[in-house]
Amino acid sequence: MRPTMVAGNWKMNGLSGDAVHLTQAILHAGLEPMRPEVVIFPPFTLLHAVSQEAKSSALRWGGQNLFWEASGAYTGEISGAMLRDMGCRYVLIGHSERRQIFAESDAQIVQKIKAALLSGLIPVVCVGETEAERAQGLTDAVLRRQLEAVLPLLNLEASQPNLIIAYEPVWAIGTGLSASPEQAQAVHVFIRELAAAYSAQLARRLLLLYGGSVKGNNAAALFDQADIDGALVGGASLQAGEFIQICRAAESAGRGG
């Protein structure tokens, strides 16, 4: 049985006081450790504050991005080793905002995934289609293109996948819209089938998160779907009560283990 995960992407939000408040709220919520695994992705400037609060707990944290070089004259960038030095276990790669605003290509995303793996980080790789692509019936084609760049990086000699996939329909991010549980499930099945072409065993164990306006009032229905293993939460992760409600929905789904 695959574990569950709820990941909160704080994006470019919060100061140190906010980080302490949110982290403490999660820690004091009485969630059962690792069911689900709870991960937060704060801005780089808040990683230290989060790590100091969470270092003796089951709560995990990660970076929102990284550069593919280990060090050098890359002003404004951050390396995998730097994230590891801050206690990060995970890193987001290929978020739709990075793809759209910063024009990150599939090739660049592959470079970042490789750098993350070399640094001992677990990449949470984001894929998804825009509203225009969806309207043209291109969802499967877009996902196939994005994933055919990523899935060859699966370590076929490992017993567990070395990365996580987050499906984020771009049309649902920050809009209040969300794919129905059945729509999201269908896409997750498609992703798992693509992964099975590389390894049926790893595909069965591959953690697939849904990210698209996940909230406390729709999380349970999403987590009831067989191939939705958790959520990548955006705006709702900045509201302690809402985020904890999502975590409790994952906890109640009974799929941890």
Curated annotation (Swiss-Prot):
GO process terms (BP): gluconeogenesis; glyceraldehyde-3-phosphate biosynthetic process; glycerol catabolic process; glycolytic process
Segments forming a coiled coil: none
Pathways per UniProt: Carbohydrate biosynthesis; gluconeogenesis; Carbohydrate degradation; glycolysis; D-glyceraldehyde 3-phosphate from glycerone phosphate: step 1/1
Binding site for substrate: N9, W10, K11, G174, S213, G234, G235
UniProt main location, coarse: cytoplasm
One Pfam family per UniProt: TIM
Gene Ontology MF: a single term: triose-phosphate isomerase activity
Top enzyme class: isomerase
CDD domains: TIM
Active-site annotation: H95, E168
Subcellular location: Cytoplasm
InterPro entries: Aldolase_TIM, TIM_sf, TrioseP_Isoase_bac/euk, Triosephosphate_isomerase, Triosephosphate_isomerase_AS
EC number per UniProt: 5.3.1.1
Function per UniProt: Involved in the gluconeogenesis. Catalyzes stereospecifically the conversion of dihydroxyacetone phosphate (DHAP) to D-glyceraldehyde-3-phosphate (G3P).
Family: Belongs to the triosephosphate isomerase family.
Listed name of the protein: Triosephosphate isomerase
Organism field: Acidithiobacillus ferrooxidans (strain ATCC 23270 / DSM 14882 / CIP 104768 / NCIMB 8455)
